[in-house]
Amino acid sequence: MPTINQLIRIGRESKKDKSTAPALKCCPQKRGVCTRVYTTTPKKPNSALRKVARVRLTNGIEVTSYIPGVGHNLQEHSVVLIRGGRVKDLPGVRYHIVRGTLDSVGVKDRKKSRSKYGAKRPK
């Protein structure tokens, strides 16, 4: 325990908060190129084949990001936009691909929550 005098002289060091999406480097989104598109299984107790992509960002960092929605057109060398946001049951996946921008098309026949999946308004 420091004395009152030591606290007056030096003071306490304030805690720095850690970023949940460090690869974005304080940007809201970043562009990148898919290096690998594959499926992976979630941790217990869930069971599925989750679609994920390994993305090399414009700042040189390579991250694993989740492809949301039903069906996608992504393959190797596709240019995508990623945003922060982790997937709770996939360890190491801390980013989401933004649907409906760059090479990623929006989800087809989506009626609700369209803006989140890049779907146009149905006629």
UniProtKB/Swiss-Prot annotation:
One of its GO terms (biological process) is translation. With S4 and S5 plays an important role in translational accuracy. It comes from Geotalea daltonii (strain DSM 22248 / JCM 15807 / FRC-32). This is Small ribosomal subunit protein uS12. One of its GO terms (cellular component) is small ribosomal subunit. The keyword rRNA-binding applies. Belongs to the universal ribosomal protein uS12 family. HAMAP family: Ribosomal_uS12_B. The modification 3-methylthioaspartic acid is found at residue 89. Part of the 30S ribosomal subunit. Contacts proteins S8 and S17. May interact with IF1 in the 30S initiation complex. One of its GO terms (molecular function) is structural constituent of ribosome. It holds the Pfam family Ribosom_S12_S23. InterPro entries: NA-bd_OB-fold, Ribosomal_uS12, Ribosomal_uS12_bac. Keywords: Methylation, Ribonucleoprotein, Ribosomal protein, RNA-binding, rRNA-binding, tRNA-binding. Residues 109-123 have a biased composition (Basic residues).
